[in-house]
């Protein structure tokens, strides 16, 4: 796994042993960042369910000013810090060890982009989306990007948000939502 483009292009990121973390495939990551490229300059990014930190790190590499990484697992947070050090992005990032629900319940920060790539086997995605739409952490015009397996439908009907489009890449679907 590597940083695809930007200031840290080509830097190899560490990945965990085992299958507990499922990093986004390079092809999907490339597509995601092509879709949101014009949203990135100077953006504040929340990488929820951060895992290795690869999505937030890619965002910083491509021009985001700051990324907040949130993961419930200590080993994941340690890995994110190591990957931030490899890319020299430590000063543009913060790593928080916390489960997503507690983090969102207490969050006072505002973001331009929220990246949601939770474990596929859980119900985290819809719960996190619901919480995000009920609290005020996304700037007006900001976007939420979700990653999910093709076989998992995503129902979304929250006032103040528009579902823009689904992008399919093999067995993976990216969905974008914009705050009105």
Across the structure, where does each feature detected by a protein language model lie?
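Class I S-adenosyl-L-methionine-dependent methyltransferase catalytic core
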Residues: 1-180
């Amino acid at each position: 796994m590597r940083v695809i483009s930007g200031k840290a292009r080509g830097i190899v990121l560490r990945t965990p042993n085992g299958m507990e973390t499922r990093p986004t495939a390079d092809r999907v990551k490339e597509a995601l960042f092509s879709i949101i490229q014009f949203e990135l300059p100077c953006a504040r990014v929340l990488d929820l369910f951060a895992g290795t930190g690869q999505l937030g790190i890619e965002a910083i590499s491509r021009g985001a000013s700051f990324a907040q990484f949130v993961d419930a697992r200590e080993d994941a947070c340690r890995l994110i810090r190591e990957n931030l050090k490899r890319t020299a992005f430590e000063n543009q990032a913060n790593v928080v060890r916390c489960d997503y629900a507690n983090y969102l319940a207490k969050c006072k920060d505002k973001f331009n982009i929220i990246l949601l790539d939770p474990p596929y086997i859980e119900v985290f995605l819809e719960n996190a989306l619901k919480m995000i739409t009920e609290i005020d952490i996304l700037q007006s015009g900001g976007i939420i990007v979700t990653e999910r397996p093709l076989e998992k439908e995503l129902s979304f009907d929250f006032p103040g948000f528009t579902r823009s489009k689904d992008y399919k890449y093999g067995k993976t679907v990216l969905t974008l939502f914009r705050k009105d």
